[in-house]
Amino acid sequence: SGIKAKIIKNYLPIMNQLINDYLSKMNFFVSFSLDEEFNETIKSRHRDKFGYMSFSEGEKARIDLAILLTWREIAKLKNSASCNILILDEIFDSSLDGMGVEDLTKVLRVLSKNNNVFVITHKGEQLTDKFSQTINFKKVNNFSRISKS
């Protein structure tokens, strides 16, 4: 009880909706919800319950991204933080499969309409067609060289 509990209670339905919207945009069709103590409940289409750890690394990455992007939205809604920059470090370098890369790229394209989105990756050559601009860093004689394409 108290002010913090009331704030959480007010924003929790919005958070759960946003998380599920982002998961859907990334073609991950589960029902995700957080309770007032931030315990998650994840249900499949057939309403079987799953724990976070039972998902593949790529599926966990989608869940993590949905939560991350939701927190950004909540901060904007609350007027406590509004930032037009999103920096994602090595998000494409780990566990997203080809479809996950495509789905995340679509979400980032939409976000880039109102935000400056920067993706740091070691797989630049595989992603050049996914972004409108790239900035490349290459180490030459112990100095970083920058080129833009």
Where are these regions (language model features)?
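Charged, surface-exposed helical/loop "interaction arms" that form contiguous linear patches used
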Residues: 1-31, 47, 82
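Catalytic phosphate/metal-binding cores of nucleic-acid and nucleotide-processing enzymes, i.e., regions
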Residues: 11, 37, 108
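Conserved catalytic network of the ASCE P-loop NTPase/AAA+ motor domain
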Residues: 25, 32-33, 55, 76-81, ...
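ABC-fold ATPase nucleotide-binding domain signature/coupling loops
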Residues: 29-60
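GG-anchored amphipathic helix commonly corresponding to the ABC/SMC/Rad50 NBD signature/C-loop
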Residues: 57-87
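Catalytic acidic motif of RecA-like/P-loop NTPases
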Residues: 73, 90-93, 125
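Conserved D-loop/post-Walker B switch-helix segment of ABC ATPase nucleotide-binding domains
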Residues: 78, 82-83, 91, 95-106
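C-terminal lobe/lid and adjacent interdomain/linker elements of RecA-like ASCE P-loop ATPase modules
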Residues: 99-149
